[in-house]
């Protein structure tokens, strides 16, 4: 993840050499900090940070050459939302940025359906508990810990 840019990077790890390879952008664009669902470089983020990998049982034995079984969820601080990035590089909104307030704002403190009602104000921390299928979100400007499930 890159706090100063609008991109999500990946670097492969070599367990024998105990080193990481060169990072590459898997979603977003370093020079365009905005908001857009999409695949790879067509997606747009604004200060993506603090992500967690969550095993997706729908992927079975895994997909792609790496047999990936995980989605990557992360905070987008300036877009006031949580993203889901799948192994194909498809970025989709997981929570936040529901309908604008009457004053045109997309942030705030609203509980409810993650895609249609929930609002955050600078989410900047994310943890996941696989035993309860629960996410815990550090909602900075709302000064609280919020929670949601994946389904």
What are these regions (language model features)?
Residues 2-5, 13, 56, 77-78, ...:
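Short loop/turn segments immediately following the C-termini of beta-strands
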Residues 1, 60, 71-74, 134-137:
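Conserved beta-propeller blade signature
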């Amino acid at each position: 993840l890159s706090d100063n840019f609008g991109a999500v990077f990946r670097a492969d790890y070599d367990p024998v050499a105990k080193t990481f390879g060169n990072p590459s952008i898997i979603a977003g664009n370093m020079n365009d900090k905005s908001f857009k669902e999409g695949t790879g470089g067509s997606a747009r983020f604004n200060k993506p940070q603090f992500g967690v990998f969550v095993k997706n049982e729908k992927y079975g034995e895994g997909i792609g050459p790496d047999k990936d079984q995980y989605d990557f969820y992360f905070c987008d601080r300036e877009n006031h939302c949580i993203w889901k990035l799948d192994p194909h590089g498809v970025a989709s909104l997981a929570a936040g940025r529901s309908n604008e307030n009457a004053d045109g704002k997309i942030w705030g403190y609203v509980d409810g359906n993650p895609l249609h009602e929930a609002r955050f104000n600078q989410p900047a921390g994310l943890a996941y508990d696989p035993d309860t299928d629960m996410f815990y979100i550090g909602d900075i400007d709302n000064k609280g810990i919020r929670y949601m499930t994946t389904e």
